[in-house]
Amino acid sequence: LDAYFEALYQTEDIVELKTLENQIWLAWRATDQPAVDDFFAQGMDAMQVADYRLAIDLFTNAIDLHPDFAEAYNMRATSHFLLGNDFESLTDVEVTIDLEPRHFGALMGGAQIAMRSGQVELALEFVEAALEINPNNAMWQVVAERLRDMTGTLDL
């Protein structure tokens, strides 16, 4: 993963950036533990059909078997977010980041939770942390700029 993150930090090529992001996501989702992978895959399937409560249960099963599986926490956070459970979602975002500090997906998820609750400064902190990992993501740059405008913060 370190090589992917180093390349992600350095690239300005949009195609390479998206390829690297996808490779990182694939690496985050791999555990080499069949039962864990099965629960995770079933959770992803449940999310595809908007059965977020089932997804939460399945991701929890994966976490019970593999407590260090950051991506299971991240997807459970996403499921909670989609159900409007912001406290539970933010709790899982924090665990995800504790397990994988470079988890730009969890950081951006944290920003969404913060925005939904009106915590613009916290949202900006999450987005800026994601940009430290992936500084050339144009969408995140725009989000950060808008949040800075909302908070009156200058980009230094």
Feature locations, PLM:
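Helix-start (N-cap) detector for alpha-helical repeat units in TPR-like alpha-solenoids
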Residues: 36, 70-71, 104-105, 138-139
